[in-house]
Regions:
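RNA pseudouridine synthases
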Residues: 55-69, 76-103
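Helix N-cap / loop-to-helix initiation motif
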Residues: 27-32, 73-76, 117
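Flexible hinge/switch segments at interdomain interfaces of large molecular machines
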Residues: 10, 14-16, 51-59, 91-102, ...
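Single conserved hydrophobic/aromatic residue that forms the stacking wall/gate
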Residues: 1-8, 13
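Translation machinery proteins
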Residues: 14-64
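A general structural motif
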Residues: 46-47, 84-92, 113-123
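Positively charged, low-complexity, intrinsically disordered RNA-binding extensions
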Residues: 106-211
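Residue-level signature of catalytic and energy-coupling elements of molecular machines
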Residues: 8, 27, 33, 80, ...
Length: 211
C-alpha cells in the first residue's frame, strides 16, 4: 500500500460525504480531498474510482512512486509513463523502487515562530506512541507506525499542538543527490507534470533536494 492506503481497492463515489469519509479514513491531505471531490462530483460523475500506484526512475535513477486516483487506467497509465520517459529514466514494474521506502505515519508539527521547546515536544511525541522524532527548521517531524498515526495525532492535538500535515507517507530509506543542474531541472519538470495531472494524488521520491 502506498500513500493514502487505498491502493488496490475501488472507491465507489456516491456523494460528498462518502468521498470525505473515505479520504479522511485514509489520512489523505485536505488539498487532495478537495481535488478528489472536484474530480468525482464536479459533473455528477458516480463512476468507480480506483487508487493505483506507478513506480519508476527520475534522472540518474532517482526512485519515484506515484499514487493516482482514476476511473480509467487506459488514460492514466500512458500519461504517467510519458512523464517518466520525457524527463526521467522510465516507468518500471510494480515493486521496482518501493522496496527502498518505508510506509510510515508522518506528523509535522508547526514551529515557525520557534516558541516550542524541542525536548518537551520530543517527550510528548514519544509518550503519545511515536516511533521517532526529528527537529527541522520551522517544524518538528514525528514518525509513527501507520496504524498508530491517528492515536498519536489525537494525543498531540489534545496537548495543543498544531499540525502542518498528518498523513501516511512512503519515506525513503536513503536519499540521492543530483549533481548536474540539467538533472535537477529535469527532475523539477517531471515533478511539475505529476503535480499538474488531476489523476495524481501523491508523489514520493528519494531526491535529496538540500544543496
Amino acid at each position: 500500500e502506498i500513500g493514502s492506503g487505498l491502493v488496490g481497492s475501488e472507491m465507489c463515489i456516491r456523494d460528498r460525504a462518502t468521498v470525505v469519509a473515505k479520504a479522511k479514513a485514509a489520512n489523505m491531505p485536505n488539498d487532495n480531498i478537495k481535488r478528489t471531490i472536484d474530480k468525482a462530483l464536479g459533473s455528477g460523475n458516480t463512476d468507480n474510482y480506483e487508487s493505483v500506484t506507478y513506480e519508476g526512475y527520475g534522472p540518474c535513477g532517482v526512485a519515484v512512486i506515484v499514487e493516482a486516483l482514476t476511473d480509467n487506467r487506459q488514460r492514466t497509465a500512458p500519461e504517467i509513463r510519458h512523464y517518466f520517459d520525457k524527463y526521467g529514466k522510465g516507468m518500471g514494474a510494480q515493486g521496482c523502487v518501493s522496496w527502498s521506502f518505508d510506509r510510515k505515519g508522518v506528523i509535522v508539527i508547526d514551529n515557525e515562530d520557534e516558541e516550542l521547546d524541542e525536548d518537551t515536544v520530543m517527550m510528548d511525541a514519544l509518550d503519545a506512541g511515536a516511533a521517532d522524532f526529528q527537529p527541522e527548521e520551522g517544524c518538528f517531524t514525528v514518525y509513527t507506525d501507520p496504524d498508530d498515526i491517528n492515536t498519536v495525532a489525537k494525543a498531540l492535538e489534545d496537548k495543543g499542538y498544531k499540525f502542518d500535515s498528518a498523513q501516511i507517507e512512503m519515506v525513503p530509506q536513503s536519499y540521492q543527490k543530483l549533481d548536474k543542474q540539467e538533472d535537477r531541472d529535469n527532475m523539477e519538470k517531471m515533478l511539475d507534470l505529476f503535480e499538474e495531472d488531476d489523476d495524481v494524488q501523491n508523489v514520493w521520491h528519494n531526491w535529496d533536494q538540500e544543496e
